[in-house]
């Protein structure tokens, strides 16, 4: 029988999207991809070559996250944190570190999908409110996505042409990423200070994970993301192999794996990203506009574009051409 945490972790963000909306996005993406390919095959090919690695990488990381979750690794983290840390502020700090680490290594999508239910269950098992850990996980997963290229698909789309290794990327981004993580944690802690101060005298029952395929897959992904300049295919290979073993042993279902991946959403976003990337290569407007903006203006413009069309298509559009100024 699956634990409450494991069962809850199946309710991923994509599960709440209406089927019509999901498949409409997929249809829009396929249509956009086809239109871009017909209109300008060369530009569409260039956009696709820039955009495919992030989507392949996140698919691999989600598969690895699924295997790790089945082994109880994430649930064990939550249980151990609740057992060893009775002090509310220390629990929140530990949760922030877990969110940052999982996001950095396994991508923000994996962190949100699998850690959110774990931390909510952890909070409830202590008798306290789940708001600090719930909001903290969602916000810290985004704040912690600046440490490595694979932590956020946008990183790979915008900087893909530079082919930076994870180690080199980390050497440049660690200070800003750490500042974002700490600042976000402080804001959540201040806003939810009453719940953060909750303490507990009793410890929840222990939860023993299976240290096996999931642990090995996570470790392999961490090494590949940090060492390789283009880790998408190797990481995806690890994910496919890991989930293939589970399917062969009938410990999971193909339909469940498909639900976790959210294939219609990935296909739709990829198609829209390629279409906008093709547009960005044919039209210099976005690049010229960015060249006239300072740091704050660039951030504001990128934020608005991300809200309007999603961050991935926006990144493909705005990074279609090399910026005039860094």
Which role fits each region the language model picked out?
Residues 65, 98-107, 140-146, 176-184:
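Helix-loop-helix module between adjacent transmembrane segments
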Residues 42, 103-105, 109, 113-136, ...:
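Membrane-interfacial helix-loop connectors
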Residues 66-80, 120-125, 187-199, 244-257:
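C-terminal ends of transmembrane helices
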Residues 128, 167-209, 213:
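Juxtamembrane and boundary regions of transmembrane helices in multi-pass small-molecule transporters
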Residues 66, 78, 218-321:
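Transmembrane helical segments that form the transport core of multi-pass membrane transport proteins
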Residues 55-56, 89-97, 111, 134-135, ...:
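Hydrophobic alpha-helical transmembrane segments
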Residues 4-10, 14-39, 51-63, 211-220, ...:
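Hydrophobic mid-bilayer segments of alpha-helices in multi-pass membrane transport proteins
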Residues 13-22, 43-54, 164-176, 203-208, ...:
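Interfacial loop-to-helix junctions that mark the boundaries of transmembrane helices
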